[in-house]
Regions:
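A short, polar/charged loop-to-alpha-helix boundary motif
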Residues: 38-48
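Glycine-rich oxoanion-binding loops at beta->alpha junctions
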Residues: 48-53, 121
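Small-residue (primarily alanine) positions within well-ordered alpha-helices
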Residues: 2, 6-9, 19, 30, ...
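Short beta-strand scaffold segments in enzyme catalytic cores
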Residues: 17-26
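Zinc-dependent deaminase
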Residues: 1-9, 28, 74-146
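Short beta->alpha transition motifs characteristic of CBS
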Residues: 29-36
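Short, basic and Ser/Thr-rich N-terminal targeting/leader segments
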Residues: 13-17, 64
């Protein structure tokens, strides 16, 4: 499902990242993709939109029984939101060499100095998650964009 959301982002000329949140008690409660360009909002990452949807669905900012699935390792903003939402787990696809905040550059959700920690599982369908990003940015370079 997260890859389907990434494809929607790709088709909307957004960086193709998709996110899904699953509640252990309710099932899938949120699906989102990047919308920074369309919304003209630097915080409109797939994870942030999905967390907002999930909080609405759960009627709580505490997402203690929810797992975030995302196609790219979350950035510092999104990793911080996971901590603030008290989510127990993040499952991501491709590593984020430029802004990864779960494994690559930082380990925000695992930082013992914070009031909450989340388990991180990385590399799930990494090849497929990375391929859509590679395809998107190759097309942008070919067009002389970004």
């Amino acid at each position: 499902m997260a890859l389907e959301e990434a494809r929607v982002a790709f088709d909307e000329d957004e960086v193709p990242i998709g996110a899904v949140i699953v509640s252990l008690s309710k099932g899938v409660i949120a699906r989102a993709h990047n919308q920074r360009e369309g919304l003209k909002d630097p915080t409109a990452h797939a994870e942030m939109i999905a967390i907002t949807q999930a909080a609405g669905s759960m009627q709580s900012w505490r997402l203690e029984d929810c797992v975030l699935y995302v196609t790219l390792e979350p950035c510092p903003m999104c990793a911080g939101a996971v901590v603030l939402a008290q989510m127990p787990m993040v499952v991501y696809g491709a590593l984020n060499a430029k802004a990864g905040a779960c494994d690559t550059l930082y380990r925000i959700p695992a930082d013992p100095r914070l009031n909450h920690r989340a388990q991180i599982v990385g590399g799930v369908l990494a090849d497929r998650c990375g391929a859509i990003l590679t395809e998107f940015f190759a097309a942008k370079r070919e067009l002389g964009e970004r």
